[in-house]
Amino acid sequence: MRISPEEEVKIIKEILTAMNVPEESSDIVADVTLDADLKGFSSHGIGRFPQYVDGLRHGTIRADGDITIERETESTALINGNHIFGHVVAYRAMELAIEKARNTGVGLVGVHDSNHFGVAGYYSDMAVMNDMIGVVIANTEPAVAPIGGRKPILGTNPVAIGIPSNRYYVSVDMATSASARGKLLEAARKGESIPENVALDAEGKPTTDPEMALKGSILPFGGHKGYALSFMIEILAGPLVGAAFGTAVTGTANPEEMCTKGDLMMAIDPSKMVDPDEFRAQVDEFIEEVKSSGDVLIPGDIESMNIKRRRAEGIELDEKLLERILGIARELDINLEIKEL
């Protein structure tokens, strides 16, 4: 069935309210989750929501609480998320990075003891909406084998970058693995195969079975180049921010485990370097030059098209996910009515 964006928000907020999550936090979680579905990152949208519910039940996600700023300078900060919703922690972290960038030109905020935060691009978009460049990286629990290895040591380690422009939505949001783990989980839930050259089974053999891939490892994207980028992110979102790294990272996929991953948020104010109007105009000029070379998409075009289509056509809820959500509602004694679009 298909539901409207407003219906998705209603579902999420009704369930979180019943689980004693404050309204402000529920609003952020719902908005980030909807953003993922609208852009086409369904593996991080409402399909991921039951994992957060399980985290609340197991106590690995705290329904309420405050972040703690452990260290701070004019341009940097280190945040302890105290295991509240990762979406809320990341939102507050980027808010702080933007505030610092407004004063000093650059804001850099590290996060540890948080939780899965949904799509990284939501937070880089926050910077863009404040006429800034946004950069977000994070590590995740082991899923990726290094080149030449069989054992998962690296996470899928996403990176998102958003650039302000006058005419275009400019954003990249991607895992440094050949596939996000969430896409494997989604394929397994739907009983679908995954593409070739994405994953290995537990014996190090190529597989298109998502269940076998989840027991094995995902390949880095782009061979040794993706591996090298993931390697660096593991350090920047691990030791640099006081978070776990490598095989010590837990809780980004298994809601029964406390999350030990790290995040790094950066906001850059172009006005501290160049004239901001000229910067945006030159970004547009570059994009138009790129597009003039042929039938070319820029980073962010697909997401823009998805947003328009899904706002008009709705968001797909597959049967298994629908039953899971209705089951959660029954367990919480909620009379949840889901309106089909």
From Swiss-Prot:
Chief location bin: cytoplasm
UniProt subcellular location: Cytoplasm
Pathway(s) of this molecule: Cofactor biosynthesis; coenzyme M biosynthesis; sulfoacetaldehyde from phosphoenolpyruvate and sulfite: step 3/4; Cofactor biosynthesis; 5,6,7,8-tetrahydromethanopterin biosynthesis
SUPFAM superfamilies from the UniProt entry: L-sulfolactate dehydrogenase-like
Example GO biological process: coenzyme M biosynthetic process
Entry keyword set: Coenzyme M biosynthesis, Cytoplasm, NAD, Oxidoreductase
UniProt keyword Cytoplasm, yes or no: yes
Top EC class for this record: oxidoreductase
Reactions catalysed, as given in the entry: a (2S)-2-hydroxycarboxylate + NAD(+) = a 2-oxocarboxylate + NADH + H(+)
GO molecular function, one term: L-2-hydroxycarboxylate dehydrogenase (NAD+) activity
Top-level taxon of origin: Archaea
InterPro entries: LDH2/MDH2_Oxidoreductase, Mal/L-sulf/L-lact_DH-like_ah, Mal/L-sulf/L-lact_DH-like_NADP, Mal/L-sulfo/L-lacto_DH-like_sf, Malate/L-lactate_DH-like
EC number: 1.1.1.337
GO CC terms, sorted: cytoplasm
Coiled-coil ranges (or none): none
Known role: Catalyzes the reduction of sulfopyruvate to (R)-sulfolactate. Involved in the biosynthesis of both coenzyme M (with (R)-sulfolactate) and methanopterin (with alpha-ketoglutarate).
Homology family: Belongs to the LDH2/MDH2 oxidoreductase family.
Protein name in UniProt: L-sulfolactate dehydrogenase
Species per Swiss-Prot/TrEMBL record: Methanothermobacter thermautotrophicus (strain ATCC 29096 / DSM 1053 / JCM 10044 / NBRC 100330 / Delta H) (Methanobacterium thermoautotrophicum)
